[in-house]
From Swiss-Prot:
HAMAP family: UPF0145 (MF_00338). Belongs to the UPF0145 family. This is UPF0145 protein LSEI_0651. SUPFAM superfamilies: YbjQ-like. It comes from the Bacteria. It holds the Pfam family YbjQ_1. InterPro entries: UPF0145_dom_sf, UPF0145_YbjQ-like.
């Protein structure tokens, strides 16, 4: 099950030896609807957090991690080390998020 894939931002996992399988990533691109964009535009005028976009980014990160786990499992990995995020905007209302790292297989 992909949920059992350990994901860490560190290079080493205490007490574990492993062999490197290779790079894996999970990618998602999300957008908000027109009504959310109007609300964000109004919030931009008065200042403050744009909750709809914060929620979208949180959801995007969770989806990217889920896909990263799936890719690591397909590659035969037990864990992903050195996990990182990257994100970028596509147009005015779309956000792309990638989670990437190195899939590894534990040695017995």
């Amino acid at each position: 099950m992909a949920q059992e894939i350990l994901i860490t931002t560190t290079e080493n996992i205490p007490g574990k030896k492993y062999e490197v399988i290779g790079e894996v990533f999970g990618l998602t691109t999300q957008s908000k609807n027109v009504i959310s964009n109007i609300g964000a535009g109004l919030k931009n005028i008065v200042g403050g957090e744009i909750k709809a976009y914060s929620d979208m980014l949180h959801e995007s990160r969770e989806k990217a991690i889920e896909r990263l786990r799936d890719e690591a499992q397909k590659a035969g990995g037990d864990a992903v080390v050195m996990m990182r995020f990257d994100s970028g905007s596509i147009g005015g209302d779309m956000q792309s998020v990638v989670a990437y790292g190195t899939a590894v297989k534990f040695l017995n």
